Each structure stands twice: as C-alpha cells, then as structure tokens.
Amino acid sequence: MKISFIEPAILLNAFAMTLTIPLTAQYVYRRIWEETGNYTFASNSNGSECDQNKSSSIFAFREEVQKKASLFNLQVEMSALIPGLVSTFMLLASSDNHGRKLPMVLSSLGSLGTNTWLCMMSYFDLPLQLLIASTFIGALFGNYTTFWGACFAYIVDQQKEYKHRIIRIAILDFMLGVVTGLTGLSSGYFIRELGFVWSYFITAMVLIVNLAYILFFLNDPIKESSSQIVTMSCIESLKDLFYRTYMLFKNGSSKRQALLCLLIFTLVIYFFVIIGISPIFTLYELGPPLCWNEVYIGYGSALGSVSFLSSFLGIWLFSYCLKDIHIAYIGIFTTMVGMTLAAFTRTTLMMFLVRIPFIFTIMPLSVLRSMLSKVVHSTEQGALFACIAFLETLAGVTSTSAYSGIYSATVAWYPGFIFLLSAGLLVLPAISLCCVKSIGWEEGSYTLLVHEEPSEHTSD
C-alpha cells in the first residue's frame, strides 16, 4: 500500500544536500591547498593566529588558495548550467501529465551518482578536474532545484485549499530547519571523525534509501494519461511543454500577467542572491581573518539552517496580523541587514552574531511560491513550477559562478565586498514587490485572477 507523505523524501534529500555542500566545499579547498604549495593543512579554531600572520607568506598563500577555489567552483557550476536548465524544465513541465515522481527519481539518481563519484575521488585521490565531468553528467538527470520543484507541485496537487497548503509548507519548513540545522552542526564532526570518504558514503546510502521510498512507497497524485503518451511523439511532447508554458503567461488579464511576471522576477532575484552567497560564506570563513576549522564551519552552517525553523515561526506568527506581501518584505529587509553586517565582520563572535538577522531568510521564498501558486489554475501548477525551477536553476548556476568570480577578484583588497553587493542587489526584489503592491495585490484577489482565465491552456 502506497502513502501520500512527501515529507520523508524531502527530509532525506535535505540531509544529503546539507551534508554534501559543506563537504564538497572543504574537500575542494583542501585539495587545492595541498596542490598549490608545501604548507600542511592544519585545522585552527583560533582566529587570532590567523590575524597575526597577515604579513607572512602563509597569508598570501591563503589568498591564492581562496582565488583558486573560487575559480574552480566557477568551472564546476558552469559545467552544470546547460544540462541542468534543459533537464529541469523538461522534467517538471512534463510532470503535469506523467506524474511528479519522475523528476524526483531522476534528480535523486543524479545526486547519487555525483556523491558516489566524490566518494571514489576522495578514496583514490583522483584528479580534481574529474569533478567537473561528474557534475555535468549528474545535471543531465536534474538537480536539487528539480527535486524541490516536483515536491512543491506534489503538495499543491494534494492541498487544494490555500490555508491547508500554506500550513503544510510552513510545517515542512520547520522540519527542514531541524534536519538541516542538525546536519550542518554535525558536518564538521563527520569530516573530523569519519573523513571525506565515509561521509560521502553515508550520503550516498541516504540517497539510496530516499530512492527506495519514492519508487516503492510514495503515491503519485497525478495519474498518467496512457492515451496521450501513446499518441504524442518526443518532438510533439516537447512542443507541448513550451506551449503550456507560453499559455501560462498569455492567458488571463493583463493584471494577472503583470503579477505573474513581477512575482517570478522577485523570487528569482532573491533566489539569485541567497544561493550565490551561500558558498561564499564557507570560503570567507575558511580564509583570513577567521580561518575556521571544519567544526566551526559546521556551527556556522547550523546557524544558517536555523532560518528554516525561524522562518516557519515567522510565517505562523506574522500571518495572523500581516499580509503575504508584508511578510516577504520583512524577510528581504532583515536579510539585507545581515549582508551589510557580514561585510564588516572580522571576528568569530561577530560572525556568529551576524547570523541573527538571517533568521527570516527563507520566508520570502516560501511566501512568494505560495503567492504564485494562487495566480494560476491547478492544471498549470506543473508548468508554473517548471518555469520557476528553470529560472532558479539558471539563477543558481549563474549566481554561484558570478559570485565565485567576483569573490576571487575582490578577496585580495576587500573580502567583504561581495556581501555589500548582495545587500545592494536585494533592493531589486524590494522594488518589485512595491510594484506588485501598486498594481493592486490584495489577499483574496488571487481567486478572481484564476477564475478570469479561460480553459484554453489545457492540452487536447
């Protein structure tokens, strides 16, 4: 008997993702450190020692390693750009007809393959450049954005009422906060006690369990239409995907089109900043003046993951007295404050305290997705989230690539510049939300926008 709870799959995937990201960042950093010079990599939790060596050769060596690590991350992200965009769009858009499980399974297979390859690389000490090839192949199956987009569409399929949907999403954010927080907190101990090989092996095992759950236990609310599958060729199916995405923006009133474009722009730009700055935090903490070890990196990652929990509480509390758009404003402005403070942080204590303004970072992502889901028909949810996931994949890859390039160019003269740039970029989604407000977004008006649409978008 199959069940309809997507939460276990999301939490297992979140564990694997939260553990893999800091593992890979530190693995790449250490490999480049070892290949760049003759200095022995030592884990130091004392930032003052890092400060005292600013005039020595080790300080220049650290900066060189930071530059090389940033540029290598740029190459890795660029290798996943094209295959990630194509696979994400096709898998999620086709999920309206073929079910939500297909993109979940394929993206999990891609993650499993990448983690298995990282395990082999760390065990056999294979050339680091092979990571670029494995990332390219893994992106052909989708990525984390593909998985999350399919999961969100799955929840929308099940929860037809908006209030039930937002409660379930908020509870899921709470659970994600607990899982990612504990995983981030323990990631440093995984590296210290088990090493990279066993850490990647554990991640691969978790992904295998997740695949088994999705394949054998998870029910799919979208039933496949066998007649459509038989009569449509691959080319026709691809044309249908583009057609339904085109109709997503064409159908409805001009107000609905404007709201849809503005909300997507707001979500994508905010996502661009949040995803782009995430790996920079790790590089910034590894280098001077902080020089954190793997345990401190884990603490920082755990504090960053607390935003899932605090965002859940924020949505739950603010929803009683504020509208969705105002909740999104709070998340954007508090994140902007956090970015500005991070630019001037030079001590370990301050770096931990800087995480406080980031407590509502996830709120805009959850709220904006919910606002978007209210603007379109239930039959367009797959096309909508395929479009969002496509743009998020594009934004995610370009942001990490751009941020890595900018950080490598500015780390020598001012490492905190990238945080000030992020704070400035967050002005754009704030302005976009002002435009949404001026157009006339009101709570409850989204229902009218949906009913305004004709039913031309459905496939014959």
Curated annotation (Swiss-Prot):
Q: Residues of the signal sequence?
A: 1-25
GO MF entries? copper ion transmembrane transporter activity; symporter activity
Q: Where are the transmembrane segments?
A: 74-94, 112-132, 136-156, 171-191, 196-216, 258-278, 302-322, 325-345, 348-368, 382-402, 411-431
The alphabetized UniProt keywords are:
Glycoprotein, Lysosome, Membrane, Signal, Symport, Transmembrane, Transmembrane helix, Transport
Q: Name one Pfam family in it.
A: MFS_1
Q: Which family does it belong to?
A: Belongs to the major facilitator superfamily. SLC46A family.
Motif Tyrosine-based lysosomal-sorting motif: which ranges?
A: 446-449
Q: Which PANTHER family match?
A: LYSOSOMAL PROTON-COUPLED STEROID CONJUGATE AND BILE ACID SYMPORTER SLC46A3, ZGC:174356
Question: What membrane topology was assigned to this protein in its record?
Answer: Multi-pass membrane protein
All ranges on the Cytoplasmic side of the membrane: 95-111, 157-170, 217-257, 323-324, 369-381, 432-460
Topological domains on the Extracellular side lie at 26-73, 133-135, 192-195, 279-301, 346-347, 403-410
- Entry protein name: Lysosomal proton-coupled steroid conjugate and bile acid symporter SLC46A3
Per the record, what phenotype accompanies loss of this gene's function?
Answer: Knockout mice have liver copper levels increased by around 30%, with no differences in iron contents. Mutants are resistant to TCDD and high-fat diet-induced hepatic triglyceride accumlation and after 3 of high-fat diet feeding, body weight changes, liver mass and epididymal fat mass are reduced compared to wild-type mice.
What is its biological role? Lysosomal proton-coupled steroid conjugate and bile acid transporter. Preferentially recognizes lipophilic steroid conjugates or bile acis as endogenous substrates and seems to mediate escape from lysosomes to the cytoplasm. Modulates hepatic cytosolic copper homeostasis, maybe acting as a lysosomal copper transporter and sequestering copper ions in the lysosome. Delivers pathogen-associated molecular patterns to cytosolic pattern recognition receptors as part of the innate immune response to microbes.
Residue positions the entry lists as glycosylated: N38, N46, N53
Q: Which gene encodes it?
A: Slc46a3
InterPro entries, sorted: MFS, MFS_trans_sf
Q: Which reaction(s) does the protein catalyse, per the Swiss-Prot or TrEMBL entry?
A: estrone 3-sulfate(out) + n H(+)(out) = estrone 3-sulfate(in) + n H(+)(in); 25-hydroxyvitamin D3 sulfate(out) + n H(+)(out) = 25-hydroxyvitamin D3 sulfate(in) + n H(+)(in); cholate(out) + n H(+)(out) = cholate(in) + n H(+)(in); glycocholate(out) + n H(+)(out) = glycocholate(in) + n H(+)(in)
Q: State the Gene Ontology BP annotations.
A: cellular response to 2,3,7,8-tetrachlorodibenzodioxine; vacuolar transmembrane transport
Q: What domain of life? A: Eukaryota
User: In what tissue types does this protein appear?
Assistant: Expressed in liver, kidney, small intestine and colon.
Please report what switches on or represses expression of this protein.
In liver, expression is induced by the environmental contaminant 2,3,7,8-tetrachlorodibenzo-p-dioxin (TCDD); the induction is mediated by AHR.
The places in or outside the cell where this protein is found are:
Lysosome membrane
Main location (coarse class): membrane
Q: Name one GO cellular component term.
A: lysosomal membrane
